[in-house]
Design a protein with these regions (language model features):
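Short, surface-exposed loop or secondary-structure junction motifs
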Residues: 30-34, 88-303
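Catalytic tyrosine of NAD(P)H-dependent dehydrogenase/reductases that use a Tyr as the general acid/base
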Residues: 48-51, 146-148
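Short, surface-exposed beta-strand/loop micro-motifs that present aromatic residues
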Residues: 312-325
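Short, conserved catalytic-motif segment at the N-terminal edge
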Residues: 1-50, 71-73, 135, 224
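Generic C-terminus detector
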Residues: 334-358
Length: 359
């Protein structure tokens, strides 16, 4: 099916990896990293822009570990940690509402258009975006309904940095990537030329969009415009990685649920994977679940399945009942985000995966 996706121009390049009961049962690499002559065949070492998978591979596990360490309480109000985030209903927003998208905050804003060009991808740009986020007024009463929002994860990243006094990408490396041996799951910090050079050295990146705003083809810098304005490291986007390392992080979540020897406390994973009780919500704390009817996870995954999608054409689904992890990484936004045929391709692929490895 992946080769059919290439032939049908769903994406120029992609990787599919499936793990069952702790072992890799399928790993395949298809197409090219780019359509231009600089493109090379996709391989196990190809690094993809993971987009919103950042939420479940970096931000959410960092929040869980902060809770595990006793440094955060999910019922604490965000304004207690971010004093500027007050008034107009903001005071009622608890950390768990940022995680399960029930804060009422807007889905997304074009903040990058309001950052002075000289501040883009600098510490000043990060500060400017954060100020605009804290000025947002909830569009619904906090805790009343689910409204998917990148803004909540911008705030969660800021809160983590406030609590620990360290950049979130450093926390990610020290608490997650290094302990798990994940050398190919990383951020490209555009605020620091030295750090970004280290992140890029020796790595092959799948190209994303020929960006009209930036006026160039994006290869090794974050696709999401707001994250770019913030310097490449965001709570909502910015992570790059290979299919193997994305699957390994998924395995860390699953192992923590199934054993008492995981990186995360079992009871906290159970709490984070508990589906919201809000009517119509498919969310847990940080994660999504397959929606009823036409789901991007297709048909066949178990009722406890959790995961997430990424705008660039990425997804991760974890089915605890069959101990199955399915990773799909593509660069479907190359050369343009206007190609949305992955919305038809992805459910069919995941249905086939579920049928291939039944419970």
């Amino acid at each position: 099916m992946m080769d059919a996706g290439i032939a049908d121009r769903v994406f120029p390049g992609g990787a599919l990896l499936v793990r069952v009961q702790g072992k890799t049962r399928h790993a395949s690499y298809h197409g090219r990293t780019a359509l231009d002559p600089a493109g090379v065949p996709v391989s196990r070492n190809t690094c993809f822009d993971l987009a919103s998978l950042t939420k479940i591979l970096a931000t959410t596990p960092l929040v869980l570990l902060a809770v595990q360490h006793g440094n955060l309480d999910l019922d604490r109000r965000a304004c207690e940690l971010l004093p500027s985030f007050v008034g107009d209903g903001r005071d009622a927003i608890a950390l768990r509402m940022l995680l399960d998208h029930s804060s009422g905050l807007p889905a997304w804003r074009r903040y990058f258009e309001h950052v002075p060009p000289a501040e883009l991808s600098t510490a000043a740009g990060l500060e400017t975006v954060r100020k605009m986020v804290t000025a947002e007024v909830p569009e619904a009463p906090p805790g009343s309904r689910a409204l998917y929002s990148d803004l909540g994860f911008v705030l969660l990243q800021w809160i983590l940095e406030r609590v620990y006094g360290r950049p979130s990408d450093t926390l990610f490396m020290d608490w997650l990537a290094r302990p798990l041996g994940l050398e190919r799951l990383f951020f490209v910090d555009l605020k620091s030329p030295a750090a970004s050079a280290r992140a890029r050295t020796g790595r092959v990146f799948a190209a994303t969009e020929d960006c009209p705003w930036r006026g160039r083809l994006l290869r090794d810098e974050v696709h999401d415009e707001n994250t770019y304005a913030m310097g490449g490291v965001g709570g909502q986007a910015g992570l790059f990685g290979t299919a193997e390392d994305v699957a390994a992080m998924g395995q860390a979540w699953l192992d923590s649920l199934l054993t008492d020897h995981g990186l995360f406390r079992r009871d906290l994973v159970q709490q984070f994977w508990q589906k919201s009780r809000l009517p119509g919500s498919t969310r847990t704390l940080g994660f999504d679940t397959p929606s009823s009817g036409a789901s991007q996870a297709g048909n066949g995954f178990g009722p406890r399945t959790v995961g997430h999608l990424g705008f660039t054409g990425t997804s991760l689904w974890i089915d605890p009942d069959r101990e199955l992890i399915a990773v799909l990484l593509t660069n479907r936004v190359h050369p343009t985000r206007d190609n949305e045929s992955i919305k038809q391709f992805r459910p069919v692929l995941h249905t086939a995966v579920a049928a291939r490895w039944p419970k």
